[in-house]
Amino acid sequence: MKKRRQGPINKRVDFLSNKVNKYSIRKFTVGTASILVGATLMFGAADNEAKAAEDNQLESASKEEQKGSRDNENSKLNQVDLDNGSHSSEKTTNVNNATEVKKVEAPTTSDVSKPKANEAVVTNESTKPKTTEAPTVNEESIAETPKTSTTQQDSTEKNNPSLKDNLNSSSTTSKESKTDEHSTKQAQMSTNKSNLDTNDSPTQSEKTSSQANNDSTDNQSAPSKQLDSKPSEQKVYKTKFNDEPTQDVEHTTTKLKTPSVSTDSSVNDKQDYTRSAVASLGVDSNETEAITNAVRDNLDLKAASREQINEAIIAEALKKDFSNPDYGVDTPLALNRSQSKNSPHKSASPRMNLMSLAAEPNSGKNVNDKVKITNPTLSLNKSNNHANNVIWPTSNEQFNLKANYELDDSIKEGDTFTIKYGQYIRPGGLELPAIKTQLRSKDGSIVANGVYDKTTNTTTYTFTNYVDQYQNITGSFDLIATPKRETAIKDNQNYPMEVTIANEVVKKDFIVDYGNKKDNTTTAAVANVDNVNNKHNEVVYLNQNNQNPKYAKYFSTVKNGEFIPGEVKVYEVTDTNAMVDSFNPDLNSSNVKDVTSQFAPKVSADGTRVDINFARSMANGKKYIVTQAVRPTGTGNVYTEYWLTRDGTTNTNDFYRGTKSTTVTYLNGSSTAQGDNPTYSLGDYVWLDKNKNGVQDDDEKGLAGVYVTLKDSNNRELQRVTTDQSGHYQFDNLQNGTYTVEFAIPDNYTPSPANNSTNDAIDSDGERDGTRKVVVAKGTINNADNMTVDTGFYLTPKYNVGDYVWEDTNKDGIQDDNEKGISGVKVTLKNKNGDTIGTTTTDSNGKYEFTGLENGDYTIEFETPEGYTPTKQNSGSDEGKDSNGTKTTVTVKDADNKTIDSGFYKPTYNLGDYVWEDTNKDGIQDDSEKGISGVKVTLKDKNGNAIGTTTTDASGHYQFKGLENGSYTVEFETPSGYTPTKANSGQDITVDSNGITTTGIINGADNLTIDSGFYKTPKYSVGDYVWEDTNKDGIQDDNEKGISGVKVTLKDEKGNIISTTTTDENGKYQFDNLDSGNYIIHFEKPEGMTQTTANSGNDDEKDADGEDVRVTITDHDDFSIDNGYFDDDSDSDSDADSDSDSDSDSDADSDSDADSDSDADSDSDSDSDSDADSDSDSDSDSDSDSDSDADSDSDSDSDSDADSDSDSDSDSDSDSDSDSDSDSDSDSDSDSDSDSDSDSDSDSDADSDSDADSDSDSDSDSDADSDSDSDSDSDADSDSDSDSDSDSDSDSDADSDSDSDSDSDSDSDSDSDSDSDSDSDSDADSDSDSDSDSDSDSDSDSDSDSDSDSDSDADSDADSDSDADSDSDADSDSDSDSDSDADSDSDSDSDSDSDSDSDSDSDSDSDSDSDSDSDSDADSDSDSDSDSDSDSDSDADSDSDSDSDSDADSDSDSDSDSDADSDSDSDSDSDADSDSDSDSDSDSDSDSDADSDSDSDSDSDSDSDSDSDSDSDSDSDSDSDSDSDSDSDSDSDSDSDSDSDSDSDSDSDSDSDSDSDSDSDSDSDSDSDSDSDSDSDSDSDSDSDSDSDSDSDSDSDSDSDSDSDSDSDSDSDSDSDSDSDADSDSDSDSDSDADSDSDSDSDSDSDSDSDSDSDSDSDSDSDSDSDSDSDSDSDSDSDSDSDSDSDKNAKDKLPDTGANEDHDSKGTLLGTLFAGLGALLLGRRRKKDNKEK
């Protein structure tokens, strides 16, 4: 808000003697809104006492206007009723102490927890007179104690902004915040003053805290404008100057060196240091010894530190040097100072040269321990008739805080001391405390700047450079304080008032009485006076006495002021505790409610009246608080009345009323609070005027550490600062007027010419003031800042002489660019009389310089460095480049002379030349031949002693320097891989090779002809081929192929191994980088193979050389060393009765053509309870295009509890067209924990012919990890009747790490005709990439009943890239009861493109994982009746042609109990665009508990309409923890022909991990009746052409209870385009607790009518890359008993079945290799009839 203006102060603002030892404070008109800010701080006592001078003192009397005395008012107001109320106004007379203004010191920034009250410490404001108005209402301002008479006692301010907008709205002016910035900057500046500075400028701390000014209202009702705070702030510079660099003040000191000392130095060294330091200060020479002796006499030099010596020097130098009135203090200070008889004190002058010493120690420290406080007292300034220990704060009563102090002489500029106020007391009176204060001496000099911090309730004083000029400083102060209304809130309560001055505590108890008349209808008080914003904040309590008027109107009037619109607020009191006695209500608490808008206070046009119509609001007992703000408008007392009547008038005849009035009175009534006047800043810049033109140029920097003093028009010092690092200074809080600015002239500097430019902002304004060591400039402030008062100094001219001492390598006496300086050369400077005046040595660059020379003639002498000879002198015409010899004369004339240089040379020579690569081996350097770097060259003297070594540089050059005449030997070390070329081949010694050892002669000149050439030593290779000699003739035939992986060892002729390798996939091997010589090559025979005949042919490159071959290399490669092997034959007749449980993991890549005609009748009943905990990491990129047509009718009852957190990013493109009709009932309980770690790298090539007739009954548990490359022809005729019922409860913990690199090539033709009646449970987890043309005609009737309880925790890391295009028609009728517990953590990145067209009617439970690469022709005719439980994990890559005719009748009842614990991490990025239209009628009852923690980044949109009532009860007893880490690199190529007739009864448990590339022709005719429960996990990549005609009638009952806890992290990138038509009729009752985070984008058309009575538990993980042509017509009823007698010629090592290690028995279970049926864990079969929701 706008400040009230006041013109310049034309009266003197000093003290007039009033009576002995007292000073009355002159009163100034500061405006009616001002309040007595506080008494000024004074020093000393009586005439010798330095007192804080307060410029403006306003005394306000606080009056309580009331018709009677306090007691009378009580009774009277209690009797008032609304009908005939009486108006009473209490007046409090002005307090006498207002006349005698106490020096108010702003409390320091110490730690008082209270809010920052803005203390207006009177002491500080020299510029602005402090007004001492203490508005009677409670005013918290520290310095002033204006007296206001208020009917009600002042309301205290609470810690929180209790008076909210009205009381807290005031804020400090922007100028103050600006001050704050400057304060911090000044602090910075002061620390960087030149060497002389004491580090902290006086205003430093003041600036730092100045921001507190801005929140003066923080916890107080309203911030008060501090009358003196602005002047007290001394800004050293403006913010804009922060970035400017600091001028180095070292220029002000002489160049003479001062010895360095420490505490341990000797007394003599310390005395020398003292003498040198004193001399460097520029003290008069006749005083130097006196100061040095004084330091010696007054200090114990033996124990003294450098810091103590510096302090002693400063003290003594001050005594000697500060004798001229540089600061306008023409008489000794009124402070008590010790007068040294040797150095009487006169006025002080600044010393730039002292700053280096003064700045060293104690910069900016708290010196409370060095401020001695005596006679501290806390007394009551009583102005009313009451007990002496009672204070009436609202009647303008305050505390007086007095003390004397004495400053230790070690205190320096920037040091601080504090005054900390206790919990219940704060500085100031009714006014809000001023933030800025000053301590002044009697003559007006600023001793310290104070800053009050409301948050800590502390004033911190920062000493100015005043303390550096004087010693034995003593003083006293008298401060005003008041109870802190935020904490001392109750009337008639005893509070301890405590203040800590420096380290001295003064404490006294007082009873506080605010005079809150609780029996009055209207009670009011001035809460505080805010000088910053020029307003009085008033608080009114209404209906505090429960008068409950039926109709009431409130109005208030003011004289000599006006109400501020918008600052009248009404609060409804919800708790009477809000009406605190201190009149400092917390308006932010829940005890009050802002209802201003409800009553809409009205302010009159002239601002002198406020009206609020409460109507009937008080009739029910409501109480209200009104806050209002008054801005003084005149020079008289501000008088406010507060009325509560029935009609809003003062008519006393008809209505009773409640009234109250307050008056803020000012002594003399003519002054205005200084804080209301606008203030400005004055300042600018002191700079180093290098070009002495009196104008600031861009490259000229500021001078730090220059003392600047501000004086008023009466020559009274107002403020003083020191320029900051960038040379800036600033004085703040100045009113309009003309001021004098004095700049102390730094030593060794001269003032620049004044007013040399028309631009006043950049010229120099200072002019020397006679003989005084200051320059003076005038600055005028006229309603704006004046930032143009600046001055320049330049260094008093001194000149330099010097230049350069260099090594004149070419001895021409001229400095060349490549010639370098010589360091350490002694140079002597003599005057014209020949006296030595300086010596120096050249630096590392050969430079030297003598500085600080006056005009005159000098002689410079150069000492010849050892080993050098002076070069020619004055050889050139360029004086700056020639040599002046060892002695020369120089004349200095108003300029530096940098031409005096001297050259020397060493009489030594160089030897060297070049080492090159002689590519054409002719011993002559050709232009195209390049140097060889890094060749070691050794130099020896004539006695053969090595005197130097070096290596050739990047270009092949080398050189030895500094050699005297003589004969030398040069030896060149042959570089690795090189051979020396011919020596001395040509006539030109500069281009021929001198060989590896040669002699070089130096005779008065360099010899740069010694060179040597080398050429690269040739390297050769040996190797060839290891092949399979199928016809065993020892000769490589074109159709015979290489054998990979054969180990080949290279040895030297002594048999030491040099290297080993293995043949590549083609059987090739090679050893490189061999020198000529004899070698041995050894071939290690591959397992299962026999060495072929050696050296059987005439062609060495075609025959076999045997296993150990001796080879001689002579200047050429040898690629004829090869060897051949052929396969062993085995004939085995085995009779095996096997009970095997097989778990096979195969990887098959099959290209099959299948034409199948199957007739299947299956009845399966499966009860599956699966608990899967899978953590998978898969990176799949799938592109699937699916077009599906689903007609499903499902009846499911599901109770699922799923907690899934999935983050999947899938990009899938699927087109599926499916038509399925399935009826399945599955109950699966599986618990598998597998942790396998397999690293297999096998390469086997087996050619076996086996004719096996075996009758085997085997109970085997096999774990096979095989990599087989088999080429077999088998003809098998098997009749097997196997009835296997496996109830397996497996707990497998496999930790496998798989890194597989497989090459599979399969080509298969399959023709099968099958007629099957199967009752199967299939759990299939398949990942298929199929490109199939299938024409299938199948007739299948399946009824499957499966009870599977699976608990799987899978940890798989899969990276799949699949393309699937599926078109499926699905008609499914399922009734599923599933209870699954799956914990899967998958991270999959899949990009799949699948196009599948399948028509399936299946009730299967299959879990197959197959990876197979087979090329087989199978013709099998089998009749089997098998009841098998198979868990097959196969990964098949097969290219098979199969013609099978099978008739299968299978009845399978599977109860599998598997617990799989898999941890998979899948990274899948899927983009699914699915368009589904689903009509589903499903009835599902499922009870699933799924805890799935998957991290999937999926972008999917799913639109699904399902009604599922599924009750799945899963009995899962399986524990599976699978962590697989497998590193398999297999390359298998198998061609097998197998004819087998087997009769086998097998119960097998096999865990097989096979990677097979088989090319087999199999003709099998099987008739099988199988009751199979197959759990197959297959990974197949199949490209199949299938022509199948199938008729499938499937009736399946599926009761599945799955509990799935899945933690998957999948990042899948799939493009899915799914167009599905689903007709589904589902009835679902699901109780699911699902916490799923999924984002799916699916556009599906599904028309599904599924009533699925299908008990199928299908967990299929298949990765199939199959290209198959399958024509299958199978009718199988098989119970086979197989007796096989096999004779095999196997190329590859067969899988290790765990039987034994004999290689001859490894071909027995060829069928087991492909089956891979593993560890299907069977549990109890359970079907739940009662559905569980």
UniProtKB/Swiss-Prot annotation:
Gene Ontology CC, one term: extracellular region
Biased composition annotated in UniProt, kind: Acidic residues: 1125-1684
Region (Disordered): 51-269, 332-351, 862-890, 1085-1708
Biased composition, class Basic and acidic residues, residue ranges: 61-74, 175-184, 227-253, 1107-1119, 1685-1706
Superkingdom, natural source: Bacteria
Location(s) in or outside the cell: Secreted, Cell wall
Location of region: Type I collagen binding region: 679-1129
Transmembrane parts of this sequence: none
Motif (LPXTG sorting signal): 1694-1698
Topology within the bilayer: Peptidoglycan-anchor
Biological process terms in GO annotation: cell adhesion
Region feature Ligand binding A region, mapped onto this chain: 46-678
Entry-annotated residues carrying Pentaglycyl murein peptidoglycan amidated threonine: T1697
Record's signal peptide: 1-45
PROSITE patterns the record matches: GRAM_POS_ANCHORING (PS50847)
Record key words, sorted: Cell wall, Peptidoglycan-anchor, Repeat, Secreted, Signal, Virulence
Sequence ranges assigned to domain CNA-B in this UniProt record: 679-797, 798-907, 908-1018, 1019-1129
Polar residues composition-biased segments: 85-99, 146-168, 186-226, 255-266, 336-346
Positions of the propeptide removed during maturation: 1698-1733
PANTHER family listed in its UniProt record: TOL-PAL SYSTEM PROTEIN TOLA (PTHR34403:SF8)
Notes concerning its domains: Each CNA-B domain is able to independently mediate adherence to the substrate.
Family: Belongs to the serine-aspartate repeat-containing protein (SDr) family.
Function description: Binds to type I collagen via alpha-2(I) or alpha-1(I) chains, although its affinity for the alpha-1(I) chain is significantly higher. Involved in bacterial adherence to transcutaneous drivelines from explanted ventricular assist devices.
Name of the protein this chain belongs to: Serine-aspartate repeat-containing protein F
Organism lineage string: Bacteria, Bacillati, Bacillota, Bacilli, Bacillales
